[in-house]
Amino acid sequence: FEDTAANVMAYINKWIAKKTKATRNAMILKVADEMTKGKEVVISTIDSLKDVFNVGLDPAITTGAMVIANQNGYHSLDKLKDKEGKYILQPNPTQPTQMMLFGKYPIAKVSNRTVKSEPVYSPAFTISGSKLAIDGTTTAIDASATSDVTAWKVVKGKYVVTCKGQEQETTVDAKVSAYKHPVYMGDLKEAITLFDRNVITIDMNDKAAGLWEKDMTGIKVRDRFDVQPVDDGAIIKGNITEVVQG
């Protein structure tokens, strides 16, 4: 068992490297979301993609442009075909494992856990007697007309409704009617700067917080970096809406 500790440390170092990379990517996309908030475009056809690359992005940007999508968004793009029946995502001739959009723009697929699709809710409000009903389920909320509802939101899977100026919780399950899959298009190197000190410190301790008594060792990792927006014209965020069936 002499190499057991070394094997464990090798595994931990590999795990830390993987997590720090994921953290950087998540922060970069968080900044991208902030830069594009309220300016998202709808991606529903091949033409809508061409609108982004032909008109939405400056020609100087498209030369270094790429596409980033989560698994759901990638899957939606991967099913699109042109008028000749060819898929718009094709392997890079020089790197067969890399896919290209329109044969020009590399596309990167990231995990749905890292970049989540946004759920869309479309509650139907009706009046049942003197009570408000949501999606056919009668609530305890007094209402005489659907116009009494001025706002709603979803909290922990349930609808919270503002009716007659009062915010009230309900027991009605919020049903997802669709998902918006995010697609980032442009040159991230021009849009965002990663200030990376390339310094990761790892501290190990087996005596803190009762670790000694439990025969455990604690690990603390410090990673110093920052992400800042540079050019909001270098990136466009699109949403692919997928309707939930049933």
PLM features: residue spans?
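Short acidic/polar hinge/loop motifs at secondary-structure boundaries
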Residues: 145-146
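Extended oligomerization regions of viral-like shell subunits
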Residues: 37-134, 140, 150-225, 245
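Flexible, glycine/threonine- and acidic-rich loop/arm segments that mediate assembly and lattice contacts
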Residues: 1-40, 211-246
